[in-house]
């Protein structure tokens, strides 16, 4: 026993000596001379918290001092009493360029108080003041989005920092908390809370899809997707939303989301156990009908923002004339009213029947009787686009007022143009949504007939919208060209006609043959106007004046593509030519009734291809649906607005059949209505799934047969 007691006493002495040595205390338990007191300045303690943990050399024991030194409790030790304002974190988890939403900032004082209260009562621990969405998406130094950082382990975050004991450079952090200042040049984004897919019930809606209204630009209806004709994806759970990419001059929404709550997720559907009693096909039909309802609500929500933020803006109104204001917004109030009435009827049907019988009759009635404001709005599109471009380029006051409005959180960081084109987008998507509903009702003859009638009614409306837009554009073009073309050197041609419109116009090099040499000017010397029935060859005198040299009817024209190496020399022989991209146009019967040959050259291969396609336009009409199944298809990834007559305007998510590729440009046929034209290749991605390609062709066939498009 004595030996055991001696060993215990020795262990206590050694332990006491170790504590005093490591904490650098004197015999009385106080800090040794030269060391800061425990209750010193916060700055000294803060700095000390980041010093390396290096054991201090053992202090010599005072002579004659044999009793053990007093033990200091851990809660009263200098380490426990330190109140630092710094923290070392892995560099991989720190992003200096990440902008936080100012509304979510929390003062340091409030944070300290909340921690003290939580220490006394854990139930008072507040919820985090940051959004997980802020941590979910980040950008690496190359600008690429990196996702799921919140799921990244601490070990993965430490990768690349070296071992804990390495000789890496220390990161010096400022001990002061810096307030984040708002950047006035950066557009406000929508609140992160609006990006969360939630079924949170509000007091007024009880789990309604109205709880979290989304902008129509941010969603893509599942009914537009034909990659799986079985449409199993329409039953999938909603994927977590991604942040919308910053919008530049081109309207791009990288992260389309499903249209809010699905029918299967509705509380009344879940509580009543309806899903257990339905077949898979009936559930798909209910989802297709409900998606028309929810997407109409999103569309109506975006139209309301266009009216409240842009149309009714006094600042914007003060920078434009009354005519310019009318051209910009046209009859958008009538369009909004039509959408509200349509949505009210759909919602009333949904409230009356959780398991909706049908909505085809509602859509048919509105397409035939109430959607006529869409025709007037679409007919004004050419004036709308031209007025907007003119104001942005020449009106600084308008440009500044518009920029301020687009920064508002309600606009979601999107430009006004994305709101102005919404009626065109919605009216062209409705036939595709109705086609999906038709597929879901094929097993029920009466429902299928009703859906087919609704599809024909809405497709007829779309055709009227397209014709109205083309008619106004063509009429204005013909009147303008009538004043610019001078026929004084040739027999006059009555240019204005209701059945004539411009296909393409532009400058080309006219190659002239002089003796043994072929001469090409350093600048374009020929300006062509190609209409649907006649080709007019002119010489440009000014920006608004052209002297007509010759013309010929389209059925009296032959076109031949020629490679530079194939050009014969005027004196005979064949050798490489200096003409870069030549092609030959033969006027079999010109304005004087004789044959004339024109050797033309363009400045690029794509321009030559576009001219040849336009000049042979009538010869390409023979290709039928049967041969289009083997053509490549693309999906449009960002909206493209036609700037020339031979280009085609495309919306994001449009599907196009590719008829020709040339030098970064694609010539294709828009699936939804058969419109053809050129567009840049980098605005689209090729569809590689054979199932999706075949599904798109079948959808095109149905739309053409059912609606006579």
Swiss-Prot record:
Induction behaviour: Up-regulated by HPV16 E6 (at protein level).
The GO biological-process annotations, alphabetized, read as:
activation of GTPase activity; cell chemotaxis; positive regulation of protein localization to plasma membrane; regulation of actin cytoskeleton organization; regulation of Cdc42 protein signal transduction
Any one GO molecular-function label of the UniProt entry: guanyl-nucleotide exchange factor activity
Region annotated Required for RHOG activation and mediates interaction with EPHA2, chain positions: 275-481
Determine if RNA-binding is one of this entry's keywords: no
Q: Which residue ranges have biased composition labelled Basic residues?
A: 191-207
Q: Where in the cell is it found?
A: Cytoplasm
Its biological purpose: Guanyl-nucleotide exchange factor of the RHOG GTPase stimulating the exchange of RHOG-associated GDP for GTP. May play a role in chemotactic cell migration by mediating the activation of RAC1 by EPHA2. May also activate CDC42 and mediate activation of CDC42 by the viral protein HPV16 E6.
Description of its domains: The PDZ-binding motif mediates interaction with TAX1BP3.
Protein name from the UniProt record = Rho guanine nucleotide exchange factor 16
């Amino acid at each position: 026993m004595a030996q055991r007691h001696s060993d215990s006493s020795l262990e206590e002495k050694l332990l006491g000596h170790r504590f005093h040595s490591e904490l650098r205390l004197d015999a009385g338990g106080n800090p040794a001379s030269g060391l800061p007191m425990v209750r010193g300045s916060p700055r000294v303690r803060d700095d000390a918290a980041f010093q390396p943990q290096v054991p201090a050399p053992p202090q010599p024991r005072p002579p004659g001092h044999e009793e053990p030194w007093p033990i200091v409790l851990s809660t009263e030790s200098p380490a426990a009493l330190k109140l630092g304002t710094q923290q070392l974190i892995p560099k991989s988890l720190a992003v200096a360029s990440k902008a936080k939403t100012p509304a979510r900032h929390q003062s340091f004082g409030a944070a300290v108080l909340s921690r003290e209260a939580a220490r006394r009562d854990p139930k008072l621990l507040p919820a985090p003041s940051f959004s997980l969405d802020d941590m979910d998406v980040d950008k690496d130094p190359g600008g690429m989005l990196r996702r799921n950082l919140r799921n990244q382990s601490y070990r993965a975050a430490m990768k690349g920092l070296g071992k804990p004991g390495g000789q890496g450079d220390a990161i010096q952090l400022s001990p002061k908390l810096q307030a984040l200042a708002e950047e006035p040049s950066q557009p406000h984004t929508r609140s992160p809370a609006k990006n969360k897919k939630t079924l949170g019930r509000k007091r007024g809606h009880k789990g309604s899809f109205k709880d979290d209204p989304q902008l129509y630009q941010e969603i893509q209806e599942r009914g537009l997707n034909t990659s799986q004709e079985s449409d199993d994806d329409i039953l999938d759970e909603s994927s977590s939303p991604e942040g919308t990419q910053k919008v530049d001059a081109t309207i791009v929404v990288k992260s389309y989301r499903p249209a809010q709550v699905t029918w299967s997720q509705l509380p009344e559907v879940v509580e009543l156990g309806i899903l257990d009693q339905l077949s898979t096909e009936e559930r798909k039909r209910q989802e297709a009908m409900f998606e028309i309802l929810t997407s109409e609500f999103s569309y109506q929500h975006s139209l309301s923002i266009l009216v409240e933020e842009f149309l009714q803006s006094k600042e914007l109104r003060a920078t434009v004339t009354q005519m310019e204001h009318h051209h910009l917004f046209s009859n958008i109030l009538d369009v909004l009213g039509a959408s509200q009435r349509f949505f009210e009827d759909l919602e009333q049907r949904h409230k009356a029947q959780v398991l909706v019988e049908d909505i085809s009759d509602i859509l048919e009635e509105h397409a035939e009787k109430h959607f006529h404001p869409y025709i007037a709005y679409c007919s004004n599109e050419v004036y709308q686009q031209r007025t907007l471009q003119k104001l942005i380029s020449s009106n600084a006051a308008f440009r500044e007022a518009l920029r301020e409005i687009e920064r508002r959180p309600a606009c979601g960081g999107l430009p006004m143009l994305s709101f102005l084109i919404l009626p065109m987008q919605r009216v062209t998507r409705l036939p595709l949504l109705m086609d999906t509903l038709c597929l879901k009702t094929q097993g029920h003859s009466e429902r299928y007939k009703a859906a087919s009638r609704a599809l024909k009614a809405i497709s007829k409306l779309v055709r009227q919208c397209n014709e109205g837009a083309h008619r106004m554009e063509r009429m204005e073009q013909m009147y303008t060209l009538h004043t610019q073309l001078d026929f004084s050197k040739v027999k006059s041609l009555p240019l204005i006609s209701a059945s004539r419109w411009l296909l393409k116009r532009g400058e080309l090099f006219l190659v002239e043959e002089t003796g043994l040499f072929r001469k090409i000017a350093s600048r374009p010397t020929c300006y062509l106007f190609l209409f649907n029935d006649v080709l007019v060859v002119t010489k440009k005198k000014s920006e608004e004046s052209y002297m007509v040299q010759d013309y010929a009817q389209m059925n009296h024209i032959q076109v031949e593509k020629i490679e530079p190496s194939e050009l014969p020399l005027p004196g005979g022989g064949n050798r490489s030519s200096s003409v870069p991209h030549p092609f030959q146009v033969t006027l079999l019967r010109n304005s004087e009734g004789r044959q004339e040959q024109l050797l033309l050259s363009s400045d690029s291969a794509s321009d030559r291809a576009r001219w040849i396609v336009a000049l042979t336009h009538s010869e390409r009409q023979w290709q039928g649906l049967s041969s289009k199944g083997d053509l490549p298809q693309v999906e449009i990834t960002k909206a493209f607005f036609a700037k020339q007559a031979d280009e085609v305007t495309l919306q994001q998510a449009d599907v196009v059949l590719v008829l020709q590729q040339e030098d970064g440009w694609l010539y294709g046929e828009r699936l939804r209505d058969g419109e053809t034209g050129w567009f840049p290749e980098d605005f689209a991605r090729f569809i590689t799934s054979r199932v999706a390609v075949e599904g798109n062709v079948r959808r095109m066939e149905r739309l053409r047969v059912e609606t006579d498009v």
